[in-house]
Amino acid sequence: MSKIFVNPSAIRAGLADLEMAEETVDLVNKNIEDNQAHLQGEPIEVDALPEDMSKLQISERRPAQFTDNTGGKEEGSDEDFYMAESEDPYIPLQSYLEGVGIQLVRQMKTGERFFKIWSQAVEEIISYVTVHFPMPLGKSTEDKSTQTPEEKFKPSPQQAVTKKESQSSKIKTISQESSGPPALEWSTTNDEENASVEAEIAHQIAESFSKKYKFPSRSSGIFLFNFEQLKMNLDDIVKEAKKIPGVVRLAQDGFRLPLRCILGGVGSVNSKKFQLLVNSDKLGKIMQDDLNRYLAY
């Protein structure tokens, strides 16, 4: 009877995927609870308000149309204020997000990349919200009863020059904003993109956490080293890996990362054992060759 051996790295990678999926589901549920916090509060009792406040009437009519018959419509307004549970738009949204979270967990169990799965889920959620929660048309909130007629006046020559300068500065600002941030800094300004990049780097490192890579030694030979021997947390390894040129760009595109180059770069800075064993001159050449080979794809 043959025995089935399971690679420990595969188990660690699966556990890391499940943890990320659970954190994603918890984050979605927390956002739903925060968005529904206003629905969980207790209504204000009118009898508990001061005596002057109970006489106020809230309506969209003009001040000239206010009358003293406030008692006839209080009962109907209370019924209209509260929304029935079947009409609450957040209930189907919560069910939809829970379904998305379950689907994410299933896809990650099959071995699909987190960056690809999360990008598709974000697009689906945006399309769902766009369809079911359309933006209301802009309404004029100006109160004509409180406005005063505008007085026309001619600006002085000095004011005209100042106005032209301010307009030109606004035009320059708008043109700079429309051109977008520089290409080298766009990834640092987008928190969601950074989270996806870090998740992709962590996923690939976790898959090969115990795999040993060959490095040149000081004794003109080679030695084997892996990420476990760094004795570092995965989050710290990811932070150091992002400092290596080209790694962030490869993770954004969902390509394979030069893990030996990452291990060499992190080990040469954070591991004394690695520093004592490695030939630093040959290490730099190997890291550069790995980067060039992976970036060529």
From Swiss-Prot:
Residues 140-154 have a biased composition (Basic and acidic residues). The modification Phosphoserine is found at S210, S271. Keywords: Chaperone, Host cytoplasm, Host nucleus, Host-virus interaction, Inhibition of host innate immune response by virus, Inhibition of host interferon signaling pathway by virus, Inhibition of host STAT1 by virus, Inhibition of host STAT2 by virus, Interferon antiviral system evasion, Phosphoprotein, Viral immunoevasion, Viral RNA replication, Virion. The keyword Acyltransferase does not apply. Residues 140-191 are annotated as: Disordered. It comes from the Viruses. A motif (Nuclear localization signal) lies at residues 211-214. Phosphorylated by host PKC and by an unknown kinase. Signal peptide: none annotated. GO terms for biological process: symbiont-mediated suppression of host innate immune response; symbiont-mediated suppression of host JAK-STAT cascade via inhibition of STAT1 activity; symbiont-mediated suppression of host JAK-STAT cascade via inhibition of STAT2 activity; symbiont-mediated suppression of host type I interferon-mediated signaling pathway; viral transcription. A motif (Nuclear export signal) lies at residues 49-58. Gene3D superfamilies: 6.10.140.1560, Phosphoprotein, C-terminal domain. Disulfide bonds: none annotated. One of its GO terms (molecular function) is RNA-directed RNA polymerase activity. One of its GO terms (cellular component) is host cell nucleus. Residues 168-179 have a biased composition (Polar residues). Homotrimer when phosphorylated. This trimer is stabilized by binding to the L protein. Binds soluble protein N, and ribonucleocapsid. Interacts with host STAT1, STAT2, DYNLL1, DYNLL2 and PML. Belongs to the lyssavirus protein P family. Non catalytic polymerase cofactor and regulatory protein that plays a role in viral transcription and replication. Stabilizes the RNA polymerase L to the N-RNA template and binds the soluble protein N, preventing it from encapsidating non-genomic RNA. Also inhibits host IFN-alpha and IFN-beta signaling by binding and retaining phosphorylated STAT1 in the cytoplasm or by inhibiting the DNA binding of STAT1 in the nucleus. This is Phosphoprotein. It comes from European bat lyssavirus 2 (strain Human/Scotland/RV1333/2002) (EBLV2). The lineage of its organism: Viruses, Riboviria, Orthornavirae, Negarnaviricota, Haploviricotina.
